[in-house]
Amino acid sequence: MILLGIDTATEMTSLGLCRYGEPPFLVSFPGPKNQLESIGEVVQRLLENSEYHRSQINGVAVDVGPGLFTGLRVGVSFAKSLAGALGIPIVPVSSLDILAFSQRNCPKTVVATVDARRGEVFYAMYRKVPGGGIARISDIVVGSPEDVAAEIESLAESVLLVGHGAHKYKEVFSTVSQVHFAGSAVSYPLMPMLFEIAFPMAFSEEFVPPESVDVVYIRDADARVNFDVRQALRKDG
């Protein structure tokens, strides 16, 4: 089985092509303004480097968020378009699940975080489970770093924070004595982790038709909020 991986949920865009059981072909770059065109070019480069053909791709594993709305829409739209054209299914994976999976052997409660901008973070809590996995034990929510820190403090147990959201607001989270931080190398979702989650899902046929895939954003998009603000200012003026 060969999967194409797409992750545009954060400031770092990552793409990969992987045959199960073999090392993946990977490309990562800062998300540019012309992200959609860049994704198409990188996918073509991955195909050339791997010597695979588009017709050999069995599915598309895509990070559906939460994360930066514009980037998510670009990545998910590309995944849906390509999967529809090739007649293959999609494996949707949460950005927070990817971050948490990188810490699956940690005995502490893991809190995965993604910078939500506007002074907030998307986050969810996880615990290690038998068999080398990690399970989400909370809803995916958005909140201020102060609110997240207060929730962690109420747990009265050691917690490992992972993700860019944790490092961006490290000063706030460091006020909680039981907080520990994962390294900056896992600040963003890692494509190999996406593949490790997606392949078992694919083998279990946990697919989603392209037309049914959408982003997980939790709150109104920044674009929608900015539009509402502009409309309100016009009315006041």
What are these regions (language model features)?
Residues M1-P66:
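N-terminal beta-alpha supersecondary unit
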Residues A61-S95:
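DPxDG-like acidic metal-binding loop motif
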Residues L46-S50, A85, Q103, M191-A202:
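Stable alpha-helical structural segments in soluble proteins, enriched in small hydrophobic residues
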Residues E22, N34, P89-P189, D222, ...:
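Surface "functional belts" at beta-alpha junctions
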Residues I39, V43-L46, S50, L99-A100, ...:
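Generic hydrophobic alpha-helical segments
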Residues A182-G237:
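Acyltransferase
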